[in-house]
Amino acid sequence: MQKYQIPYNYVIQKMLKNRIKGHDGEKYPVWAWAKCGNSICPKKRKNLNHKQQNKVKITFIKPDNEVLLSDYMAYSCILSGHIVPRTKQEYENFLKSLKSKNIVLDDLKAFVRSQKTNPQTEKEMIKVQKTWHRIFDLKSNVHQACVWHIKADEIQKIEILNDSNYLYGTMNPLRANGTRPDWKKRYLKFLP
């Protein structure tokens, strides 16, 4: 969690500001899938490294006022320290602006991960963070939910997912070529 403390804190503050019900002093929310295409969570995928531990899938129902929904693909933008653009052109302008200031995308990513800072990057991050509220616009077909806790009476089903030949619940599987999906690029496809 420390690697992405700035984006996580942003979501936590949004939950508190929006008065998402159920907060009893929990430090971190529970992250869950809310929509993945025509399903609730990602389909199982072939596991290429076979290093998965057993997983548990908990299906639960919460009242709307206890859930903060965000766009998974847009959230990937803030994990990388990027803007959450409204249009492809806005994103292109963002990249041009960074280039003119000799800031590379990895500088923003390092800032978000609290690995390094400098005054120029910090100034740019203030502008970047002003776009982060757009993760709640739900533009793509993959949504995640944050809740403060799950009560026993909200649970509908518990499944043990222990087949190491498959990955469950991930949108970032390691591909045969050693890469992972680029969610920022996929998010841009949903924009005008």
Task: Set out the residue ranges of the language-model regions.
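ADP-ribosyltransferase catalytic core
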Residues: 5-100
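Active-site and NAD+-binding cores of ADP-ribose-processing enzymes
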Residues: 60-192
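N-terminal ordered "arm"
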Residues: 1-2
